[in-house]
A protein has these predicted regions:
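Short, basic/hydrophobic alpha-helical segments
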Residues: 114, 118-122, 243-251, 273-275
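Gly-rich Lys/Arg/Thr-decorated short loops/hinges at beta-loop-alpha junctions or inter-strand turns
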Residues: 32-43, 97-103, 175-192, 222-225, ...
Length: 314
């Protein structure tokens, strides 16, 4: 019957051009129409879809206007701004790593106006996907000049509350990591508590590391991610990567803050951060060696807060 055919087609899914790589077959099972409307561009690929979901996850964690640039499911650019100043968030997000922005996913949690579209055009930036809850008519006209760019208007930032993946001959499920650090989560453990400005940046940094592959370090200053290190097998290497990238793009780390998505097993990260001008640190805590990191922070007058929430991401 037509009903049986429809059910069978649903579970077989819609074929995608290919998977992560051209030699891998891929399908999407479900309805993308519930999440977004495609306004322009060619068919979405497997990589486009997983990166776009990652992008929505980042910007929807913020109440304030936020702009993120995603590459391989990692936030390589992220900034927040005041209401009506989303364009400033875009500029800061782009400046964090203009090289990695090439071929990335642009995501905003507010309407994209003409001013942002003009910037993207002037930068001659190639991007795979641009997604936002709304676009002005003029912005859309400008962005549509990019023939191959997929422009998506999201209907809802709500993502599935369960995450599913195959493992051996079975399936693993887990709850999505939806916790967002707030002021009530922060416990100052050093002699000097963070200033209001540092606290605001620490909360942004905590969101950033939540959306980076472990081991991850995020460096934030003035409401923007200025560098990050991710996917490293040691935490100190993630920090070294972040510092190197910040220096490469000309950022002054003096007054920046640092987030780690898991505890510091040794005080080496805090020591290196302080040596490079970082003034405040946020991490979950929970190491048997926490006190060594706290003592190191106190030695350098670095403020440290612990949250009790780890954000490993594999």
């Amino acid at each position: 019957s037509r009903y049986d055919t429809a059910i069978r087609s649903y579970f077989q899914g819609s074929p995608l051009r290919y998977g992560e790589n051209p030699h891998q077959k891929a399908h999407f099972i479900g309805s993308l129409e519930e999440s977004f409307i495609q306004l322009h561009g060619k068919e979405l690929s497997y990589n486009n879809l997983i990166d776009t979901e990652a992008a929505i996850a980042v910007v929807s964690d913020f109440d304030k206007p936020a702009f993120a640039i995603i590459k391989h499911m990692n936030a390589c650019g992220l900034a927040v701004a005041k209401e009506g100043e989303l364009h400033k968030a875009y500029v800061k997000a782009y400046n964090a790593d203009p090289i990695s922005a090439f071929g990335g996913i642009l995501a905003a949690n507010r309407k994209i106006e003409e001013s942002i579209a003009i910037l993207i055009r002037e930068q001659k930036l190639f991007v795979e996907v641009i997604i936002a809850p709304e676009f002005s008519d003029k912005a859309l006209d400008i962005l549509k000049e990019k023939k191959d760019c997929r422009i998506l208007k999201w209907k809802s930032p709500d993502l599935p509350q369960k995450q599913i993946r195959t493992c051996f001959t079975g399936i693993l499920t887990q709850d999505r990591d939806v916790h967002i650090e707030g002021l009530s989560d922060l416990k100052a453990v050093t002699k000097r508590p963070p200033t209001e400005s540092e606290t605001n940046d620490l909360l942004i940094a905590a969101v950033a590391t939540k959306h980076l592959k472990s081991n991850a370090i995020a460096l934030v200053k003035d409401g923007a991610l200025i560098s990050m290190g991710c996917g490293q097998t040691s935490r100190i290497d993630a920090l070294r990567q972040a510092i190197d990238k910040a220096n490469k793009f000309g950022f002054d780390l003096k007054g920046a803050v640092m987030s780690s998505e898991a505890f510091f097993p040794f005080p080496d990260c805090v020591e290196l951060a302080a040596e490079n001008g970082i003034t405040a640190v946020i991490h979950p805590g929970g190491s048997k060696n926490d006190q060594a990191s706290i003592d190191t922070a106190d030695k350098h007058n670095v403020a440290m807060v612990i949250t009790g929430f780890r954000h490993f991401k594999h």
